[in-house]
Design a protein with these regions (language model features):
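N-terminal topogenic module of multi-pass integral membrane proteins
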Residues: 1-57
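Helix-coil boundary and interhelical linker segments in multi-pass alpha-helical membrane proteins
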Residues: 1-7, 54-64, 109-123, 167-173
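Structural signature of hydrophobic alpha-helical transmembrane segments
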Residues: 4-16, 61-76, 120-132
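Core segments of transmembrane alpha-helices
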Residues: 15-16, 74-78, 99-107, 156-164, ...
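C-terminal ends of transmembrane helices
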Residues: 20-30, 79-92, 137-147, 184-194
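Cytoplasmic-side transmembrane-helix entry/capping segments in multi-pass membrane proteins
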Residues: 35-43, 67-72, 92-103, 127, ...
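Ordered, amphipathic secondary-structure segments that act as subunit-interaction surfaces
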Residues: 70-113
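C-terminal transmembrane helix-loop-helix hairpin of multi-pass membrane proteins
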Residues: 119-133, 137-194
């Protein structure tokens, strides 16, 4: 039997892992200690969804989830990355791959949650983009560097295009695939907006 709730939780966990990996790897590259990497990985993992929920004035997702699994997933993922930092040290591009997965998952998830709360397409698109991009924005601000989304990358625009498709096709999977595909293409071929 198909359990939709289990699928949603699984996809959310994959997104949390991807963004926590991205944040912790960025911390490793800045020579942060394990606590710094955990804080950065966790902030990256939950940052976008937290901003979305605060703006929508709904309960913050990780404060109400079962046994704080969101925080536990982010902390554990960050510790794993810190402990395996030598494996990832020479693979700088891997941050972008994890980030692409997180962006696609959380853009769609943020859109769906916002549309459920507001029934407004415009608000849902903005909240989807914020959910997808917010964790990376928090990560970059914590590291005192220009946020990734402001550096000419096809990042927020990938989220926007995927979410526009979601409005017209009503297929979260297709929107996810489009966002991920755009990010993979831009990483692979070094495509920029400027």
């Amino acid at each position: 039997m198909f359990n939709e709730t289990a699928v949603v939780v699984f996809v959310e966990i994959v997104g949390l892992i991807a963004f926590a990996f991205s944040g912790a790897l960025a911390g490793v590259k800045k020579d942060l200690d394990v606590i710094g990497c955990v804080v950065l990985g966790t902030a990256t993992g939950i940052g976008g969804g937290t901003l979305r929920d605060v703006i929508l004035d709904v309960p913050v997702f990780w404060l109400g989830d079962y046994m704080c699994y969101s925080l536990n997933v982010c902390v554990l993922s960050s510790v794993v990355i810190y402990l395996m930092s030598r494996v990832f040290a020479e693979k700088e591009h891997i941050i972008n791959w994890f980030d692409a997965i997180g962006l696609a998952i959380f853009s769609v998830q943020g859109y769906l949650k916002a549309f459920e709360a507001t029934s407004n397409f415009e608000v849902a698109i903005i909240m989807g983009i914020l959910t997808g991009c917010g964790g990376g924005l928090v990560r970059d601000v914590c590291l005192n560097r220009q946020p990734f989304i402001f550096r000419g990358e096809m990042y927020a625009s990938a989220s926007l295009l995927g979410l526009l498709v979601l409005i017209f096709v009503d297929s979260p999977l297709m929107a996810f695939a489009l966002i991920l595909g755009i990010r993979v293409a831009t990483i692979r071929y070094n495509l920029k907006l400027k």
